[in-house]
Structures are given as C-alpha cells and as structure tokens.
A protein has these predicted regions:
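Structural recognition of alpha->loop->beta junctions
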Residues: 1-6, 111-123, 146-151, 217-230
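Short glycine-enriched, charge-decorated loop/helix-capping segments at active-site entrances
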Residues: 66-67, 167-174, 246-251
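Conserved, mostly hydrophobic/aromatic
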Residues: 77, 94, 128, 156, ...
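Conserved N-terminal phosphate-binding loop of PLP-dependent enzymes in the Aspartate aminotransferase
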Residues: 122-123, 227-228, 243-247, 251, ...
Length: 323
C-alpha cells in the first residue's frame, strides 16, 4: 500500500501503471451502451446520449478504454428526456465521450437528436457538455441560434492554438477553422446590448515538442482571437501506448507548470472581461435548490452564476434578471 500526500499527486498515475504491468484485461462489453441520466438536483439533469470515441488523438487512451463510438436510437432517448421533464426538471445537459459523434451506430446524427429533443414538453433549456469543433456545423449553429431551447453556452476542445502542435496531436482541424467557427457563432448569436456567448475551451500545455515559441502561439490565439469566457487547462501527461508517450522531446514538468500558470492568469483576465461585457444585460436564470448560507444560486443561459437571498418559491423557476 502506498500513501501519497497532497504534493505528490503527480506520482499517482505512474505508480498505478507500474503496479498493473503484465495484467491483461478484456475489452468484452465495450461495444455496449448503457443509457443513463442523473437528477440529483431539482433543476438540472445530465443525460448521457453517447459513449466511446473513434478519434485516435496521439495523446489519448479514451478510445481504448471506452471503445468505439456508439449510442442508442433517438427513439429511446426521447422517453428519457420526457421522464426527466416529468420530474419537474427544466434543464438537461447532454453528455457523452464524443457527444457530437452521436448516431454513428444507429444511422442518425447529433443534429437529428437535438431537433427532436427541442420538442420535448416541459424541458425549457438544453446545454451541450462538449462538442468537437469539426462536428459543430454551420447548419447546426444556424438552427441553435434561431430561437431554440439550446443555450449560448459552448464547451469546445481546442487543445492547442498552434497548427504545428495540432497536427502532431492528430486533431482534425486547424486554428483558422477553429477561429472561423467561433466567429460564426458570435455573429449568429450576439446583438448589441445583448448577452455574450459563453465559450469554454479545453487546452493541453506541454505536449511533446511544444517549444516556448509554439506555446506562445496558443497563448496569443486565446488572448487575441478566441477570447473565451473560460479556459480548461490540462498539463500534458504521458499515456502508455499512445504515440505521444514514445516521443523523445517531452517537456519538463517545471515548464508545464509555468505555462499552466500563464494560462490561468489569462483565463482570469478573460473571464473578468466576459463578466464586464455582460454587465447591465438582461438574462434568464434558473435557480437551484441549494441553500448556501441563506443564499441561492442559479445560472444564466450563458453560464453566469447569479446569487440571491434564499427563497423556496424561486426553486426551479426561470426568472429574468439584470446582470
């Protein structure tokens, strides 16, 4: 038995990998899909619509751990959304491993799914937990921004703002395509004096071969072009069996730590700018049931947390507020 202190978290995964060397595991059952939804809160539910991934990004073991992309038919998902609505829940977050790849195993597609979910009575708001930029089509954006129940909240993996690193990661887009997608969403969604779109962006720092100059391409791309409301920052971690793990040009941990801090500082700056850009804007808030020291919280459509004095009359209700 090994015990790790709070400062030794980086040793946990290598230690586990060392212990399981030589242990064989079966992939039996990875072709199954087990639909599920959670309803721990009275206001929001997470509905799993997809599992697995067919992408083979050079740093990732998810396709091997979770199997190929798969899902159940839309005809079986709609009743789950209806059951959620019957519990009085008004917001659903769609989840999956590669959510936008929905339909590969049933001959359908993600656009088919969201259009049918939009018609479920009782559900007033939808969020997409994460979607690959190449799977978020202009046709889909046009529909989402036409007055549907889908909110102006996008979680999109970028991973790197440097084309050299994107190619070496095995990603399926370049920075020009990514920037064009972000700009298109803003053009279709935002009006003067109205809410700004929330973009949450995933970024990996310290991928093998990422020099200081290449990292700064990512930094400047985020700061000057994408300008997200939030950056989810992950230091690259070697995964046995992946092409990236075998590379000799690994980045030192101390360099990764420095780059993470730089992006955390940038994230704080960009998030503050996002909040200021929404100040004075009217938005709808769905209040949650939790009593936090006499206060209750809820989120606007563009994912700004709003607090007010606790009042059970507001639980599960959508009300307009001025930010």
């Amino acid at each position: 038995t090994e015990v790790f202190g709070a400062t030794e978290k980086s040793r946990i995964v290598p230690s586990i990998l060392e212990k399981v060397k030589g242990i064989e595991c079966s992939d039996k059952g990875l072709g199954n899909f087990f639909p599920a939804y959670s309803s721990g809160e009275r206001t929001r539910s997470f509905l799993k619509v997809q599992d697995g991934c067919d992408y083979k990004c050079h740093y990732c073991t998810v396709p091997y751990a979770r199997g190929e992309s798969r899902n159940i038919p839309i005809s079986e998902i709609i009743p789950q959304a209806e059951a959620i609505a019957a519990e009085g829940i008004k917001e659903i977050v769609l989840t999956g491993v590669n959510t936008g790849d929905f339909g590969r195993s049933t001959g359908e597609n993600f656009f088919d799914l969201i259009r049918q979910l939009n018609d479920v009575e009782g559900i007033e708001r939808y969020r997409i937990s994460s979607i690959e930029p190449n799977l978020l089509t202009e046709e889909m954006i046009d529909w989402i921004t036409s007055g549907t129940k889908f909110l102006p909240h996008y979680h999109i993996p970028l991973q790197s703002g440097c084309d050299t690193i994107l190619r070496e990661m095995g990603r399926r887009y370049d920075t020009a395509a990514f920037a064009s997608k972000i700009e298109y969403i803003r053009q279709k969604s935002e009006v003067p004096g109205g809410p700004k779109v929330f973009f949450g962006i995933d970024v990996i720092v310290g991928f093998p071969g990422e020099t200081d100059e290449l990292f700064m391409e990512t930094y400047n791309f985020l700061k000057d072009v994408v300008r997200p409301a939030f950056i989810h920052i992950f230091p690259y971690s070697r995964r046995a069996g992946t092409p990236a793990a075998e590379r000799k040009d690994q980045v030192q941990d101390c360099v990764k730590t420095k780059r993470v801090q730089m992006l955390e500082d940038l994230c704080a700056q960009l998030h503050q700018e996002f909040l200021e850009a929404n100040t004075g804007v009217e938005e709808s808030v769905l209040f949650e049931s939790t009593d936090r020291k006499g206060m209750m919280e809820g989120y606007t459509g563009n994912y700004i947390r709003i607090s007010r004095p606790y009042d059970p009359e507001f639980i599960g209700k959508i009300v307009n507020v001025t930010i």
